[in-house]
């Protein structure tokens, strides 16, 4: 019995309104999301609310392609499955199954096992051709996509297993030094024995601050998806080698942490310099060597490594990676991994969290505060003259802390959660409200059986519902131009409803903000590199 179950009766009218809204959202996407010229079960990643035209990628050569990127529709699948669970009707699950089955039967590379999807590749909704930004060569990339493997495995177990084999095989360039990269080659033949490679640590803490030199960029956002996939593979096949490889890869990020502070790293290697460093500081390709050392080395010395930078977007390290690891541990408990996850979070916040301003200090992972530092030269991290400022602590950062506490009952985490919540409450619920914060508070209320936090979660859900539900769809606001299928809020709202209906454990966990496409895009006749999530979907309506 959940603290939320009483609400199922006392506020039934509100729950019914929310479910009606989610149903409207799903029906409108089904009505307008398919191709008009060549209807199939595939859906556009999003469409214009006024015209119902699909979101397109504008290529620099002048042609436009309506985007259907299955990797950017995994939260949509979670939404459909959650709706079937809560309403006890199969029609939503059937929609998810038909769409997934159609994709898996037609858009899988037989050689590599990889799907035609991801950060640099999608299916043209009208022609069904595989397309992608030319500058990215349509390579395979997943960065915190965390696909809904549980459901994909139900639809087609063999192709899901083959994908994970191909995913690891295509992204690990050299197993002897664990040289891996965010880009995978579709030309690499799938290896069914991919997890039988021998394992040895490539990071030696005694050599710190020196890290292995690799051609590939061992970014944590790319590594997280590999780790997550390996554990899913182990769960469905019983292959202990896959789980061992997932843990081994995560261990390299742990070994690369600062030995004094224990603060985490963005990657466990430094880019190998393969070409002479150019005079132009704006040429920041990784083959010129470590970009942080090049831009900041003269001032900061050995600590200036890409791995040690904690002054750019912290979501991959503090939200996305911990959420993936904690979801793994929910299914496959491992005390050592849990200790690693919690240590990374606690050590970071010990040094970087400013309670008074409720913000995160920009830092090197040796604990050196970079607040107000002015860049001396151009480079990978920004232009000369850039001044670093603290990052406001958004409510999203609370979700992994809550989930880590739920698995560990760690007193320090609980203290940190209470402190952050008190600071967020002072901002006011309207200002602090976000989908991930709603999820965090819902899970906290459920765990503590707290009527106070259950009521707070309910109030936040009402605020977010009014903010996001317009035109019969869940959108960023009534002023935004596009609906986006991978928006997590509808699925998060269903998580709250599931708690009210005692179906908490039956709905899929929400783990990610969704997928993206990244590459060259035509803007006013010129080519610019964009993310669709940062350039297309934030567009407002033109009145």
Curated annotation (Swiss-Prot):
Q: Where in the cell is it found?
A: Cytoplasm
| EC number from the UniProt entry | 4.2.2.9
Major subcellular site: cytoplasm
The alphabetized UniProt keywords are:
Copper, Cytoplasm, Lyase, Manganese, Nickel
Q: What induces it?
A: By galacturonate and PGA, and inhibited by EDTA.
GO-annotated biological processes: pectin catabolic process
Catalytic activity line of the entry? [(1->4)-alpha-D-galacturonosyl](n) = 4-(4-deoxy-alpha-D-galact-4-enuronosyl)-D-galacturonate + [(1->4)-alpha-D-galacturonosyl](n-2)
Keyword Lyase present in the record's keywords: the answer is yes
**GO cellular component terms, semicolon-separated:** cytoplasm; periplasmic space
Q: Which family does it belong to?
A: Belongs to the polysaccharide lyase 2 family.
**UniProt name for this protein:** Pectate disaccharide-lyase
- Which organism does this record belong to? Dickeya dadantii (strain 3937)
